[in-house]
């Protein structure tokens, strides 16, 4: 392209600078809103939550969160789901999101921290004991079965990532 005047060259240069500046603005990253600290996980006004504790057959205390629909009918028995978190995680991450969504859909849901992780008992912290992890699912079924509003014959499991394998192992060991 042949430019015939310095004016056209200046205009072209100005347009090039403007387009680069606009492009850089489109890629600007905005920091997350941390005004509420790190507790920025999804919550629903349609769901009630309660921290619960129960023991597995090894006598270890397992800590979980029970999710129930706010509009539960007195005397009715509800289908329930146990939600296991991904390996090396805690319930406040993916498991609570799944449990909240299930409670919004009308299920009673229970997420829990595997032994050695989060708020559940066990040392050394972060230990990997698949038999204990599978037992925690069985203990969660037993715990939910004691709730008057849960249909003991209709308790299912959602195992996220590695918890899927532990849930399958639990059904094999404790059908």
Stretches with model-predicted labels:
Residues 13-24:
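Bacterial N-terminal signal peptides
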Residues 33-76:
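N-terminal cap/lid segment of alpha/beta-hydrolase-fold proteins
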Residues 75-86:
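Short beta-strand element of the alpha/beta-hydrolase
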Residues 88-100, 114:
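The serine-hydrolase catalytic nucleophile loop
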Residues 101-121:
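Conserved alpha/beta-hydrolase
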Residues 127-148:
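Alpha/beta-hydrolase active-site loop
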Residues 149-161:
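Alpha/beta-hydrolase fold nucleophile elbow
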Residues 164-175:
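Short glycine-enriched nucleophile-adjacent loop
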């Amino acid at each position: 392209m042949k430019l015939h005047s310095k004016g056209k060259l200046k205009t072209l240069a100005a347009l090039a600078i403007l387009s680069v500046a606009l492009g850089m603005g489109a890629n600007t990253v905005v920091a997350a809103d941390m005004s509420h600290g790190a507790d920025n996980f999804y919550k629903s006004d349609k769901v009630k939550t309660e921290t619960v504790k129960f023991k597995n057959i090894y006598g270890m205390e397992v800590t979980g969160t029970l999710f129930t629909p706010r509009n539960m009918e007195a005397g009715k028995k509800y289908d329930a789901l146990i939600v296991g978190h991904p390996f090396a995680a805690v319930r406040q991450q993916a498991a609570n999101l799944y449990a909240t969504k299930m409670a919004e859909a009308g299920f009673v849901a229970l997420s829990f921290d595997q032994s050695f992780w989060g708020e559940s008992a066990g040392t050394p912290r972060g230990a990997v004991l698949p038999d204990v992890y599978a037992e925690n699912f069985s203990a969660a079924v037993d715990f939910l079965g004691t709730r008057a509003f849960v249909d003991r014959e209709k308790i299912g499991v959602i195992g996220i990532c590695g918890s899927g394998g532990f849930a399958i192992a639990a059904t094999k060991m404790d059908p």
